A protein has these predicted regions:
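A feature for the membrane-embedded catalytic helix bundles of lipid/isoprenoid biosynthetic enzymes
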Residues: 1-9, 79-186
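Active-site flanking loop/helix segments enriched in acidic
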Residues: 15-20
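Short, flexible coil/turn micro-motifs enriched in small/turn-prone residues
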Residues: 21, 55, 68, 124, ...
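Membrane-embedded alpha-helical segments that form the functional core of polytopic membrane enzymes
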Residues: 23-72, 102-113, 155-165
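Membrane-interface alpha-helices at helix entry/exit sites of multi-pass transporters
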Residues: 73-78
Length: 186
């Protein structure tokens, strides 16, 4: 029996779309949400991001069904995820800077740095042959936290949570690699 995700993937493939099309469509939608955020339309942006969330899973299902999974597709998906997340946080930073809300701007930068470092520490760890999946706040969790904050009109709380927990996650990954490297050295 096909899952709803597989049915959607099959339908989109029949329309002539590819997994990469869906990945880029998702990014375009996220950039649109970032613009909404920049102008203070948090609820609409949260709704748009929520509606776009399934596309992040559909592109992979499409690639598997079409039997065209590729390293480039996985790479493109990861890169567009980073662009999308940074665009959303950038929209908030812009909005708060226009409001003169320095605390929001600073938290936005710390959250953005943490988010990038969560991804970077995992990629670098895995590139060196270590496991880099540990931590309390992966991309999916960060997205959920941000969506909730946008939907309730209080993204500052979400960004504060992301700023703290994303950086803790990056540190957890650093310490995990340190432990793994000590085990490797023996």
């Amino acid at each position: 029996m096909k899952t709803p995700l597989e049915a959607i993937a099959r339908f989109l493939l029949k329309l002539g779309l590819t997994a990469d099309h869906i990945t880029l469509f998702g990014l375009a939608g996220q950039l649109g949400a970032a613009v909404l955020i920049a102008f203070g339309h948090f609820g609409w942006a949260g709704l748009l991001v929520l509606l776009l969330a399934p596309f992040d899973a559909v592109d992979g299902a499409m690639a598997r069904q079409a039997r065209v999974t590729s390293k480039f597709g996985a790479f493109l998906d990861s890169v567009t995820d980073r662009y999308a997340e940074l665009a959303l946080l950038g929209g908030l930073i812009y909005y708060w800077s226009q409001q003169g809300y320095t605390v929001g701007v600073m938290l936005g930068f710390v959250a953005a740095a943490g988010s990038v470092l969560v991804s970077y520490t995992r990629a670098r760890a895995e590139g060196l042959g270590f496991s880099g999946k540990v931590g309390i706040l992966s991309r999916v969790e960060r997205a959920i936290v941000l969506i909730v904050g946008l939907l309730i009109g209080k993204p500052i709380y979400s960004v504060g949570i992301i700023a703290v927990l994303a950086n803790i996650t990056a540190l957890q990954r650093i310490f995990s690699v340190l432990q793994q490297s000590k085990t490797d050295a023996r």
